[in-house]
Amino acid sequence: MGGDPAPRGDFAVLTDADLAAFREILGDDNVRTDARSLDACNEDWMRKYRGNAGVLLLPARTSQVSAILRHCNARGLAVVPQGGNTGLVGGGVPVHDEIVLGMRRMNAVLSVDPVAGTVVCEAGCVLEDLEHALNARGMTAPLDLGAKGRCQIGGNVSTNAGGLRLVRHGSLHGSVLGLEVVTADGTVLDLVRTLRKDNTGYDLKQLFIGAEGTLGVVTKVAMLAPRKPTGVDVAVCAVGSFADAVAALRDARTKLGDCLQAFEFFDRASLELVLSTLRGARDPLPKTKAPFYVVTETAVFGDGSGKGSVTHRAARRRVRAWVRSLRKRGVAIDGVVGEDAKHASALWNLRERISVALKHAGAVYKYDVSLPTERMYDLVVETRNRLAASTSASTSTSTSASTSAASTSFDASKVSVLGYGHLGDGNLHLNVSSPDGYHPGLEAILEPFVYQWTAEQRGSISAEHGVGAMKPRELAHSKDEASIEAMRRVKEVFDPRGILNPYKVLPPRLTEHRSKL
Ligand code: FAD
Ligand code: 2HG
Ligand code: ZN
């Protein structure tokens, strides 16, 4: 799990006087110290990371966020901004006793402009709620992810979440037009703009996109809200090899072109897990036991009456024809196109809910990497080989890869390695499921191997989930020391006392390391 947690920094300890100051700012109800509130905000979605915050603060306005941070900065109290707490790298929960700043009360959609195709909302707006508000105006959010029912737009911006439709909408670095951010000393940066063009010096908002709460608290977001399609089609194709999955992607880019919204893949192990774990999940192509599956989503706009536009029926015919042509040319073994919205959503769920199935199965080691598309699945194969080699090197089914056998042995026969992800973006989700729990021995087989292998391909050790508490010490696999040092200097500009989300993203300086030894 990324080794031992970083030692507690030299931050102040929360006192009754601090709680009284917070109550003054927020009112009694929004300063939570009860066990239920603290349990929920101290533990992450995977139940892998757990902190020990003594208070959860729930502001409703930017001015309150500003007053809280002013107080914390003056006192030297550490703070973790928390959105929907669906992050997968332990970034949104405390490592030690940091104060949790929950954004859920700041959830208003402030303005929607259907002509410009823009929306402004508060950071605590749940992505699915925003989607519904936009759908009512014929618009859609520029991102979609499996956690949409819980994650917040401020969390999405702060992690630079990618998700399922990046193929169509691009990254949030392009879709976000403006932000309001409160920096560590309580300063409010009003960078909220809905302009498409604004070349007035440094584009400061970009620094906060993907900063994971280490530079400031995002309080408002302005972003593009594209037109909602009048119809979508989902197809699942079974393919005989990963190379065929890549060939199907290449083909889709030319044949489905502008309509393509998503191009995802999963392997057989992922499908088996979903089928055995999630109620109602059905094999999309029960006659074929393929090693890989690709999922496409295509969109149609308009009602077919305008020049060059097609009806949804015609668009679906086009997708069916594409699937048929893949089969005819031997790229796909079989394929199915969703017959209606219910069928389409059942097909999507097979891909979208793999993480939920993994959570049901027990402990899981997650790696979220960017790699050259053709080589993406090699990492899954290499990981399986490595696991098998260490298992056969062991005398029994229990294996130990580290010094203390008693604490590191695990039953390798229960461990499974899954590969799935956003094929259209070159983003692999390598997941190693260990139903019996986390084991240092298993971790030693996986790390630093996965990071080193990724670095050798000049990939990224975090494609979309971020660095959080999991990977600060691995950052050097994806960034050189000069770049990491530049990041530290940026941190010092916005948060000189280092109170915002300490222990996350940035690795400690070597000198800091040494002084602690
Ligand atoms: P949190 O988990 O609460 O926080 C995440 C980070 O952002 C933390 O560092 C936190 O401190 C910071 N933060 C949160 N809010 C603010 C704020 N207002 N200001 C400053 N910092 C803030 N991720 C993807 O990229 N693509 C996917 O397809 C995807 N699918 C997922 C599917 C499931 C089932 C789950 C559980 C997770 C998935 N994720 C995915 C990961 C996660 O949902 C995203 O990282 C999401 O953007 C996190 O949003 P959140 O509101 O839950 O943030
Ligand atoms: C997805 O694409 C998410 O489903 C989660 O990014 C991936 O759980 C994971 O590893
Ligand atoms: Zn993903």
Locate each region found by the language model.
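Noncatalytic alpha-helical scaffold of FAD-dependent oxidoreductases
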Residues: 1-517
